[in-house]
């Protein structure tokens, strides 16, 4: 949506479409669909191709978290006419999987322009959410998976029951079960950025919100679990053939030992450690520890902020649109560092 909004500001001829499963409910003619589409998920692409569309597609990643094995696992990533990496670590993942892929460019994450430019009224937000502004504010924003396991996602909120000033924001996939808990379901237009600005400490497992918090140099706590949804060695729930060989996938699964390296990244020999880490039951005491040593992991935060989000400067959408325009004009991906 941020990229679409910025394109409208630039007076581009663009449309934002929801591609429905039933072609009867799609309020457009496939013949009138653009020769170029921008996607952040593969399902809309599959649907328009099934309807007969045969143009070029541009893929924009929808988060900053590099822990999931999904990213670059499937064929549609490797057939993209233009693919944007949110940051250098994503580029390294692709190079490890497919060193011959030539259509990728560093782009950043358009949603982060809002995080960069945002200002908040802390007093008003604290009053609205019944928080004490004189005490540390804790944001708990886990990844999805709560509906699959009591050990995943928003279910770990129970370990914060006795902690003051906690805001819990579930992943959209867990909204249904989160409604039974003391969690906030943001409006679609609201998002999580204002809560990242508001919080003094951000707690998650493997969510993109950890990297987003590091962009603002906010201390984070990563929850250590024996498995994470969508991460090795857990089996893939998607019924889709992988572009990566089964031998390579089996090798990655066997190499991943969460008890020894909880935050080992897939396909590359790196550990995504941005701050303090702990088991869920140790969250209360770790929060106190973080408050006493906020600067301990400042170098980790800076490093992973830069690795996960390229050029966090408030101009990500503008820069990405310049590269899209250049691609349409020249028919080849061209890396641009500055905006026109």
Question: Can you describe what each PLM-predicted range is?
Answer:
Residues 15-22, 184-189, 272-286:
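Short acidic-hydrophobic, aromatic-tinged amphipathic segments that line or gate anion-handling sites
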Residues 37, 53-59, 187-240:
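A donor-sugar binding/catalytic signature common to diverse glycosyltransferases
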Residues 174-192:
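Nucleotide-activated donor-binding/catalytic signature segment of Leloir-type glycosyltransferases, i.e.
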Residues 235, 244-340:
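C-terminal amphipathic helix plus adjacent low-complexity
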